[in-house]
Amino acid sequence: MPGYYLWTIGCQMNQAESERLGRLFELWGYSLADKAEDAELVLVNSCVVREHAENKVINRLHILRKLKDKNPRLKIALTGCLVGQDIASVRKKFPFVDYIFQPGALPDWGEIPEGFILPLKPPVSASITIMQGCDNFCTYCIVPYRRGREKSRSISELCCEAAELVRRGSREVVLLGQNVDSYGHDLPEKPCLADLLYALSDIPGLLRIRFLTSHPKDISQKLIDAMASLHKVCHSLSLPVQAGADTILAAMRRGYTSEQYRELVGRLKTAMPDISLQTDLIVGFPSETAEQFDQSYKLMSDIGYDAIHVAAYSPRPQTAAARDMADDVPVAEKKRRLKLIEDLQKETVSKANSALVDTFAEVLVEGRQKNKWQGRTLGGKLVFLESDLPLEGCLINVKIFKASPWSLQAKLVKILES
């Protein structure tokens, strides 16, 4: 049986798409190889949202080219945001790649089965892509140029897929999209994300629902109310702010001010006092002054996120920022600001996690890692515990006895659902 190997970089959507492609390869008669050197087919699922990510992809492709020179039978497949909408130019740049297809698409060199392409035994927490693309065109972001405009899947189709995942063993679904809060506006019935959450909540056996990523300007009160009232929907929200200074937010074309963002956070915390917030932040955006960075730092400190995904600005081709704005913040200053935010995050999360010691939490157990059970709280915090019981897929109550910045240690108190 020929082997396949997956190399994926980037967001959770890329991870979900790679899992689906892996299952398709298995239906075509391939088996998963331990390493690229043992495979007849290697898939590279690419990311170009940052320059560093794009460089990693290109480096990996050149490594595979050398591997192909040694093994002419090796087939290389490329998808993801490096491909985007222009396959011809990518093929010209990487002529040694055998198969190239757009992100979110399926390859055309084999028979595509009808229905959903799902693993026989999906993970406890399974991802579902509810929409592709983005219509926002933030000035720094390459995603709309590579994944195209927003295209949503119907509620009925998504509910069928979620129900089938649950039938095969999943207990949680994570809804994915570049901007899930604009879900449905392109469909004839004009449903919204809240409508989808209500529909999914009716699926028997589904214990939890998460979604990401959100855009602050598109979060409605209807969505907040749905999150607060539906017990299956986790009180966890990825809410990228990107900057704390209004001048920079306007230059980014984000569509809100820092005060509007703070007001939104206030409404979320009023509706769900236990909500866990994560954010994305760019430091060193063109023309960002020290004072403007200080405003970002203050915003991070005031809100107290459970996770801050911070990155130094890097120009992306095709974007308005790369075309019209000078990348004028020195690299050393970008690194300094990056380090300040990373240090703040560690301090903030350490303090928040330490406050959870001796408290109880509801955890969905996802599997084992290093001889311990691993799961997540409703807020998405990673929890490890020891037990000889078969806990995979169980919803349990635990008591936390130890905390670190990135995980919690706990003891089993009670199995709530098995």
Curated annotation (Swiss-Prot):
Reactions listed under catalytic activity: N(6)-dimethylallyladenosine(37) in tRNA + (sulfur carrier)-SH + AH2 + 2 S-adenosyl-L-methionine = 2-methylsulfanyl-N(6)-dimethylallyladenosine(37) in tRNA + (sulfur carrier)-H + 5'-deoxyadenosine + L-methionine + A + S-adenosyl-L-homocysteine + 2 H(+)
Stretch forming the signal peptide: none
Keyword Iron: yes
First-level EC class: transferase
Keyword Ion transport: no
GO cellular component terms, semicolon-separated: cytosol
One Pfam match: TRAM
Subcellular location: Cytoplasm
Cofactor remark from the record: Binds 2 [4Fe-4S] clusters. One cluster is coordinated with 3 cysteines and an exchangeable S-adenosyl-L-methionine.
Listed InterPro entries: Elp3/MiaA/NifB-like_rSAM, Methylthiotransferase, Methylthiotransferase_CS, Methylthiotransferase_N, Methylthiotransferase_N_sf, MiaB_methiolase, rSAM, rSAM_horseshoe
EC numbers on record: 2.8.4.3
Record keywords: 4Fe-4S, Cytoplasm, Iron, Iron-sulfur, Metal-binding, S-adenosyl-L-methionine, Transferase, tRNA processing
Cystines in this chain: none
Protein name per the record: tRNA-2-methylthio-N(6)-dimethylallyladenosine synthase
